Amino acid sequence: MNDVIRDFFKMESAGGILLVIAAAIAMTIANSPLGESYQAMLHTYVFGMSVSHWINDGLMAVFFLLIGLEVKRELLEGALKSKETAIFPAIAAVGGMLAPALIYVAFNAGDPEAISGWAIPAATDIAFALGIMALLGKRVPISLKVFLLALAIIDDLGVVVIIALFYTGDLSTMALLVGFAMTGVLFMLNAKEVTKLTPYMIVGAILWFAVLKSGVHATLAGVVIGFAIPLKGKKGEHSPLKHMEHALHPYVAFGILPLFAFANAGISLEGVSMSGLTSMLPLGIALGLLVGKPLGIFTFSWAAVKLGIAKLPQGVNFIHIFAVSVLCGIGFTMSIFISSLAFANVSPEFDTYARLGILMGSTTAAIIGYVLLHFSLPKKAVEEVASEKNA
């Protein structure tokens, strides 16, 4: 039994599977006699904040810390290091954020409260998308995985910018000043080539608290901390950034994200009507994810190649790009996160229907994306195809 559990957690798709299980459990509990207890638990106050608040502002800051680490590593030595390798996923990511937002706005332009959710379908759930792709194993070319990873990372970076610019509340000058001071200390530690992680974590904790009190969303502190962690250690030492990234990854993939899904996907269907489910808000989100994502990513990718701005990755064709662009319509955790910010100060009904739209669009995108990849990829593992050609 222990071997089965160990093998499961070694699977690339394990994180995505746990997300689905956590969301399904949350939906089941929320619509059972335990629904009131579930909501009461999430709204229980611990050390001055509700459990839900701790998950969304506290634990998700660790997730954004991991994003910061991944983005920095990719920029310095990975798929985003050179202009040639970064330009293609960067252009695709821009299209993948613009088109869904425009579709949502087209559906909700007449509603001044709903319009604030324009960024909800612009996000991609990197863990979920990579998990679906991992189900196809070695049939997926490495270059296609790198494209999806780079695209999703740039997408996440775009979401961070959107949160900072458009979903910030009333600002506290004093807290902001403390936050800027702690940011300066973090990068001073980096400049002084401090490679021990403890000082970064102490200063980072103060930064998180300052940002929490400033009116800017606290999760952004995680990204700043991630960018401050040094990639290279002192001579003969391991990389502090890679060490932290590898240490955090299992906790984020198998703990924080499933817990976030459990806390946020538990939508009570009581009072939900078919007319509400087919209203402009959920439809704008679902179609933004399901139609806008592939439309934007594929169109911008195709145009970039045809105009000579970028080249297709080796071993990848436009059918693969389209399949991946559909897969990027899985907004799930990131879209739910933005929804919680966008509709924090309006009727709870907005957030309920938004989350249902996210679940509809993300689930459909996951199924269609998987089917497209299944039929467009080689039937044999990439390594087997290569060895047969060389034989």
Swiss-Prot record:
Primary localization class, coarse = membrane
Which Gene3D superfamilies does the protein's record reference? Answer: Na+/H+ antiporter like domain
Q: Name one GO biological process term.
A: regulation of pH
Q: Does the keyword Secreted apply?
A: no
Q: Which residues form a coiled coil?
A: none
Q: Which GO terms describe its cellular component?
A: plasma membrane
**Does RNA-binding appear among the keywords?**
no
Query: Membrane-spanning residues where?
Result: 14-34, 47-67, 87-107, 117-137, 146-166, 171-191, 205-225, 252-272, 280-300, 318-338, 356-376
Q: Could you state a single Gene Ontology molecular function term?
A: sodium:proton antiporter activity
State the UniProt keywords alphabetically.
Antiport, Cell inner membrane, Cell membrane, Ion transport, Membrane, Sodium, Sodium transport, Transmembrane, Transmembrane helix, Transport
Kindly give the InterPro entries that the UniProt entry links to this protein: Na/H_antiporter_dom_sf (IPR023171), NhaA (IPR004670)
Q: How does it sit in the membrane?
A: Multi-pass membrane protein
Could you tell me where this protein is found in the cell?
Cell inner membrane
Question: From which domain of life does this come?
Answer: Bacteria
Record function comment: Na(+)/H(+) antiporter that extrudes sodium in exchange for external protons.
**Record-stated family:** Belongs to the NhaA Na(+)/H(+) (TC 2.A.33) antiporter family.
Q: What is this protein called?
A: Na(+)/H(+) antiporter NhaA
- Organism (species): Vibrio campbellii (strain ATCC BAA-1116)
